[in-house]
Every structure is written in structure tokens, then in C-alpha cells.
Amino acid sequence: MAIEHASSIKKVKNFTLNFGPQHPAAHGVLRLVLELNGEVVARADPHIGLLHRGTEKLIEYKTYTQALPYFDRLDYVSMMCQEHAYSLAVEKLLHCEVPERAQYIRVLFSEITRILNHLLALTTHAMDVGALTPFLWAFEEREKLIEFYERVSGSRMHAAYIRPGGVACDLPANLCEDIYLFCQQFASRIDEMEEMLTNNRIWKQRLVDIGIVTAENAFAWGFSGVLLRGSGVAWDLRKTQPYDVYNRMIFDVPVGTQGDCYDRYLCRVEEMRQSIHIIMQCLNQLPKGMIKADDKKITPPSRSQMKQSMESLIHHFKLFTEGYTVPNSETYTSVEAPKGEFGVYLVSNGTNRPYRCKIRAPGFLHLQGLDMMSKNHMLADVVTIIGTQDIVFGEVDR
């Protein structure tokens, strides 16, 4: 009788579920193959490459100036931070000194970009979990910041403003005053968002103790940015390896304790507050002077010069068609982008085009840790974990 009972017990197989790529919580074109034991995740297998455009190869066929706009289109939520990394890499190869005013403007817009990114990351994450209102409120603030982008570069998203040697053009009249007014009222907007989320019972139930990453695991998987700091590691390239004028800025690095989704949320909120402090310091310390390097090999002549001098017109034409040559060398340069460490490994062979440009996208490394983060969690928690990773597929697939 016992033998008959044992033979009647059937082995239950795990259930395979395709999540995305047309899912609103997939944050782009993520195809996730989930192996489920009931509603518990046994394995998560991300399939990437659906947004691959061959960016790194395309850069090899462009001059150093023409390659710049590709960086706006990688992580299309934090545009200027990526331009910043590429420009620093080219300047390192050229041994080019950037004027002080240009450095302050770069830092100013890098922090504006950080707020832009975190507003989108936090509110889309909240929307995935079920809170719609913060998303609608945050986009009102994002619109103001995008207008600053538009006023300085003429473009709302793909600015191509931070360039090797400095910035494209000087700040327009009254822009600093408007940024100052924005900073004064933005802290209260963050408070309003925190009132809705931080101590909300449902929000905490969905985030606390979900997707825990220990400091050891964060290092092992190559995590950076908020995913590393949320695990209790105070690593921020703006502090540890300062670039431009970050060594003159006074700000704190927010660090978590548990390494869960809730800690990462708190880190992002505090980072926005710290970005306001940095922006205010940039506005107060902004010096007068040049905004482009005083090197005619790299810097194009001004419009007024071109209208008066034929040599300047020829110089401008050759600079944007042929470009400038960069000495035989290689460099790895990284910046603290909103999503983590964004790095550019640039190899020059002495011509006017890069021999190789390898991009270190933080989202690519974070996504490969999704299986580790979501194991033994419920299916609904996978959405929370993807939201807290802050993935954008422009940089993941490249």
C-alpha cells in the first residue's frame, strides 16, 4: 500500500514565465525569463540586446567631436554626465587644461542631471509599486530642469553641451537667477514626495527587506553608485577621485545600512538634497572668464570672429570636418553618474578618430545581479527590484 502511494506522488516542475519586453515595468526592452516555484522566484534570466545599436563601433568611424552626441543617447535620462566622462577622457589624452568657469558650469549641470535622473527613477519605481501621484508631481519639477537644458544648449534632451576643452557656449542671461529660485523651492517638493512615500505603510511593506545586497556581494558583482552606497559602502567618485571642481564642493555621501530597496530609495532622496547644496555652491563661486580651452587646435573660433576673418572660417570648417589629432595614448576615465560609475576607456592611435572606445555602463553590471537579488522573493517583488536598480537600456545594450 505504501509503495502504491509513493508512486502516485507526482513531481511538480517549476513554472517558466516570460516577463517583457513589452511590459510597462520592464523599463525599456528587458526580456526576463523567470523560473517560478509557485509564486516564488527560483531563477531570473535577463535577456538583453534588443536595443543594441553598435555605439562603440560607430564611434570608431567618427572624429572625436562627432562621437560626442552618441553619449547623450546611451543613458538618455542622465545625458550631460556621460558627455562629461567622454570629454574628460579626451582632455586627458590631449593634456588639455579646462578654464575654471567651464569646470563650474560642468559640475552645475552634472548635478542638475543627477536630480533629473533621480526624480524619474524614484517616481517610476513608485508607479511600478502602485503610487501614481509622485510621478505626476515630479514631472512638473523635471520640466523646469529640462527648460534649463534647453536654454543653455537649445535641446531638451540630447544637449551635446559639455565638450572636450570646456562647454559649447556660455550661460545665457538670468539663467543663474532662475536656477537659484528653483533650488530654493525644490527642497519643499522633495518633502512633499517624502510625505507620500517614506513612512507610508504600503511603501515600506513593499520595499523593506526586499532585494538585500551585502557589501561583499556588491563588490563581487561590480555594483557602484546607489546600489553600492545602499549596502553601507561610502564610495562616491566625486569624493574619492574628484574631477573638475568637486574637490572644492562641500557635501555628504548618503549611505544605507541594510542594503535593501528601502535604503536605496532613501539614498536617492538624500542625494537630490545634496545636489541642491552643490548647485548653490557652484552658483555662489562661479568665476568670470573663458568657457573653452585657449587651444586653437581644439577650440573653434567664435561666431563673431568667423564673420570678420576668412582664416577663422577655414579653421572652423576644418575643425568640424577633419577634427583634431590626438597623440598615441590610452586612458580610462570615470565619473559618478546618477546610476553609478560611468567609465570611458579610450584608445588613440594618433589620428583624428578613436581607435577603440569601451564604455563601462553601470546598468549593465547591475542587471546581471538581478538573479542574485530576486532569488526566493515573490513575483511582485521582481518589479520592485528592477525599479530600484534604475535600469535604462540605452546604456545596457549600447
Curated annotation (Swiss-Prot):
SUPFAM superfamilies: HydB/Nqo4-like. InterPro entries: NADH_Q_OxRdtase_suD, NADH_UbQ_OxRdtase_49kDa_CS, NDH1_su_D/H, NiFe-Hase_large. Pfam families: Complex1_49kDa. It is found in: Mitochondrion. Keywords: 4Fe-4S, Electron transport, Iron, Iron-sulfur, Metal-binding, Mitochondrion, NAD, Oxidoreductase, Respiratory chain, Translocase, Transport, Ubiquinone. It is an enzyme of class 7 (translocase). Gene3D superfamilies: Cytochrome-c3 Hydrogenase, chain B. Its cofactor is [4Fe-4S] cluster. The keyword Metal-binding applies. GO terms for biological process: mitochondrial electron transport, NADH to ubiquinone. [4Fe-4S] cluster binds at residues 261, 267, 282. It catalyses: a ubiquinone + NADH + 5 H(+)(in) = a ubiquinol + NAD(+) + 4 H(+)(out). GO terms for molecular function: 4 iron, 4 sulfur cluster binding; metal ion binding; NAD binding; NADH dehydrogenase (ubiquinone) activity; quinone binding. PROSITE patterns: COMPLEX1_49K. Its main location: mitochondrion. One of its GO terms (cellular component) is mitochondrion. Binds 1 [4Fe-4S] cluster. Its EC number is 7.1.1.2. Complex I is composed of about 45 different subunits. This is a component of the iron-sulfur (IP) fragment of the enzyme. Belongs to the complex I 49 kDa subunit family. This is NADH dehydrogenase [ubiquinone] iron-sulfur protein 2. It comes from Nephroselmis olivacea (Green alga).
